[in-house]
Amino acid sequence: MKKIFVMMIIASLFAACKQSGPTGENKDLAKVFGDYYQDRLKLYPIEATFNGDNRYNDLLPNDGSTAFIKQAQDFYKGYLDKVKQFKRDDLSEADQLSYDIFTYEAQINLDRFKYHFEYMPFDQFNALPITMGQFGSGSGTQPFKTVKDYDNWLKRLSAFAIWADTAVANFNKGIKAGVVLPKTLVVKMIPQMESFAVADPTKSLFYGPITKLPKDFGEGDKKRLTDEYTKAIVNIIEPTYKKLGDYLKNEYLPKARGTSGLSALPNGAAMYAFSVKAQTTTDKTPEEIYQLGLKEVARIRGEMDSIKNIVHFNGDLPAFFMHMKADPRFRPFKTPKEVLDAFENIHQRMQPNLKKEFTHVPKCPFEIRQTEAFRAASASAEYYQGTPDGSRPGIFYVPILDAKQFNITSGMESLFFKQA
């Protein structure tokens, strides 16, 4: 999701430049930003698909390869050089803001390559194999409306095995360098990979688009696509996911580490400091942010103590937490639909107040969905942006492993407001 967020920033920057001509903004700088945005979509076609741009839906870059990393480094260096030809002090206030956002975003992406994050090519959250499952199910971001859409997915899928081979090679490089994932994460990744390796192609998640073939497709196209999707599942999907699952279980897991944070890795302190900078967009040190966090925890804990006293609970705060977790009154749901309906109720109560709080509100449709079973066990609630033209809704995904254990005191409203 991080990359999607970056694309939103760059898209906004580009749009602002396009709309700012009459106020004296630099048209040459705006062109550089526009070129950057378009070239970035070509470089990262998965991001383009998420962003609703379907021109590159047939492409899947091998983004962990040495060649791609060199290409990406040259891309960021080239555009930084172009932008730095403009003197910031000579720009309008609006262009200075765009200049600062751009140089920060491009430099952060360039600096990322110093730390060899490609040695940990995916985990249980951020994983192309999971994204491929979402795309290939036929109900995600990848469109399946035309014959060309179906062919685009086959072309994109054809590059997946090569990507997976590179991922395994990078995991092995990480083992040699001591840059490996924690065991606690790897054990969650293994069943994810295994869930995709289904022997019967018609039972595969990736057969979903075939079960939803549009009625206006010709019979010849329907037969061809059914045959080609079946072959792709048998020859690409099943063996690739099996290979990833077997590798993680038999080779990588024994080499994975018992520690948890990045700081436990070689050069881990620098990796962590970089990640903090990238995530917070500040120059605060990890220690400064940690101390800020401690202050916030103390403040919130004080408010929790006040609530405990207001409701006349007899006991300390840990006992109060256990009470809220165990009391059946706080677990009223019996089915996943009831959980989703509760979130929809929050949505309906929130909706009339949006225009009071925000100048601009999204025009695209909005949906609340249960997180797909293949990733629910390791997922958190999350929001996938819709497209500006409204052709794809924004989707709030909620993992519901057991509706009867879903607790209303877990912060449903705050979770919904933050994510959705």
Outline where the language-model segments fall.
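Sec-dependent N-terminal signal peptides
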Residues: I4-L13
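N-terminal maturation segment of proteins
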Residues: C17-A420
